Amino acid sequence: MSVTTTNNLIIPEVVSSLIDGSLGDGVTLLPLAEQDDTLVGQPGDTLKFPVFSYIGKAAVVAENGQIIPGQLTASMKSVTVHKYAKAISISDEARLSGYGDPVGEGSRQLAHALDHAVDDDLFQCLNDVGVARKYVSGAISADTIADALTLFGEDPEGQKVFLTDAAGLAALRKDPDFVGRGDMGEELVMHGAKGEVWGCEIVITNKVRDNARTREKNYFIVKPGALRLVNKQGALVEIQREPEYMRDNIFASLHCVPYLYDESKVVAITQFTGLAVLTGDAERLGFKTVAGESGKTRVIVPESWAAPAGYRWVYALNTAAAEEGAYGTAYAGGTNHAGNDAQVAASGKTHCHLLLVDGDNTPVKTLTVAVHAGA
């Protein structure tokens, strides 16, 4: 009589161990992301946390002078856990044929598939960084990186990683300021670093490329702790047997969510490749108009979207809902944004068009919001 043994079966615990052992190996940005286990074993799938605004520098106060208290303000940000999942099917013939290790290979590929999805979302978090953290340049060089580091202000030191594509790495290798891997120290953030420039470990990735949504190509300088990965549950593996087909289906899932925790630890070296329309994200990003005095409004540009060097925001108020501006064509008729406190005449106007333009008035970002004028 034939006896079924574990050699004839796919053991879920074994597959789970194989996946857990490989999970994370394919996430390029994992060393730059802090792990947050707040939701592990807790009810709920949403994590809320405060984002505080700086109260401003201290003032000089004369003897017996009054100290005016400042206001500590915070906005709440929330992130909701995602379920990343993938499945494969292995027939009995494939498993028993003796060619290769289909179960082991399938497990490794499932882990890679989950890593791929998480890594893509981590990079998406970086791509969503505001333009205030962007240094616009047409080429990658050691000088460009040195200039971009000024966006860290008085805190340029510490460990940093420069994420580039193959072409960027090739350009840096020809630069006299390039430090080869053999001349670098041993305390590295990323073990796959190819070299160093101005204290930035250089890491090559195929995810640095033209982004069709943002119409940008971004190279990133990232400090550890800029990103967070909220974990809800580790890899979950389930095996489904389909006897009518004589095959096993292996399902793997991972519950977590990445998000940009500290934007001040990210600088993007940006090449604009087209005109990005931000109207659909305007409210989420913080673009809006606020009613001012009678017949007037205030045009609000969020701090994280302050214009980078060489660029400025312009606006136009009218009654047309259609987006304004065309890439490669100078925009005419806009008024320079004079700050969020400036009162703008808005009587009879229904739409406010905001455009980020360069020194030649060529727009790279455009959006439209409703006009709210004072009664």
What are these regions (language model features)?
Residues 1-74:
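N-terminal "assembly arms/tails" that initiate or stabilize quaternary assembly
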